[in-house]
């Protein structure tokens, strides 16, 4: 079975984890709410007006 020849340093470990974190941050895209015009996450109710697909689902 394959095993690492050298121990992974803290710096290398943290660099690997940081790449995954920043890739996740960049993956968020925002769309304009058709009801109020504010930016909101897609496929979710708008946190500013509470509408989703022309229906009010949250009381704001």
Swiss-Prot record:
GO CC terms of this entry: large ribosomal subunit
Transmembrane segments: none
Keyword entries, A-Z: Ribonucleoprotein, Ribosomal protein
Pfam families registered for this protein in UniProt: Ribosomal_L32p
GO MF annotations in UniProt: structural constituent of ribosome
GO terms for biological process, alphabetical: translation
Family indicated by similarity: Belongs to the bacterial ribosomal protein bL32 family.
Protein name from the UniProt record: Large ribosomal subunit protein bL32
Organism: Hydrogenobaculum sp. (strain Y04AAS1)
Gene designation per UniProt: rpmF
């Amino acid at each position: 079975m394959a095993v690492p020849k050298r121990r992974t340093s803290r710096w290398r470990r943290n660099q690997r984890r940081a790449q995954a974190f920043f890739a996740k941050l960049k993956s968020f895209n925002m769309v304009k709410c058709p009801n109020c015009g504010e930016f909101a996450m897609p496929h979710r109710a708008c946190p500013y007006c509470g509408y989703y697909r022309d229906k009010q689902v949250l009381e704001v």
